[in-house]
Regions:
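Intrinsically disordered, low-complexity regulatory regions enriched in serine/threonine/proline
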Residues: 1-21, 33-191
Length: 191
């Protein structure tokens, strides 16, 4: 009676949306695959895709980490920014360095999801929180699935084209921690 597809197919749809509607625009905006030794870019296991991308702006290392899981219908894109001391000449200087400390506390405490974090109001009153999150919405027909896919593609593409606005928004909420190239804290800045 109702149209349904397997969770593995939904995972593949969301992964394809990210690869075709996000990655090209992120690359246009200067993001590259993370150069660190332990970086992920693709399938982590049967139930999870992880994409780690970053760019170097002056001495700031801007991380975008994307999680696409079988367990939910979201494309979770997270942003975190660090000030590196000393400034590398280019991002390739970070190759063959272990970057795991960028993902551990206290560094991870300033990581924000692009779709539902960094709201200027409480989530209950936020249009973006309820209607513009990166979720493949529920559907009951093939037409409904196609509409949900089209909407998710539109949101992802629109926001990845304008990724710099999210970087500016992140800066309104946080100050960058100063770290070395491996993510060791030199100066912890709050908030």
């Amino acid at each position: 009676m109702f149209y349904s597809i397997k969770n593995s197919e939904i995972l593949k749809i969301r992964n394809d949306i990210f690869l075709h509607n996000a990655v090209p625009y992120l690359k246009q905006n200067g993001f590259v695959e993370s150069p660190f030794l332990d970086a992920n870019f693709g399938k982590n296991n049967r139930q999870l895709y992880i994409y780690e991308m970053c760019r170097l702006e002056n001495s700031n290392l801007e991380f975008l980490t994307t999680y696409i899981s079988l367990r939910d219908r979201y494309i979770q894109i997270r942003l975190n920014i660090f000030e590196l001391f000393t400034k590398p000449k280019n991002i390739s200087k970070l190759e063959n360095i272990n970057g795991i400390k960028f993902y551990l506390p206290p560094n991870s405490q300033k990581e924000e999801r692009l779709d539902i974090d960094m709201l200027k109001t409480i989530p209950l009153f936020s249009y973006r929180f309820w209607f513009e999150n990166y979720k493949l919405k529920s559907f009951h027909t093939k037409f409904g699935l196609n509409m949900a896919i089209r909407k998710l593609k539109y949101l992802i593409e629109r926001d990845m084209k304008n990724i710099n606005s999210f970087v500016e928004k992140w800066r309104q909420f946080h100050k960058t921690n100063i770290t070395d190239w491996e993510g060791n804290i030199i100066e912890l800045n709050n908030p």
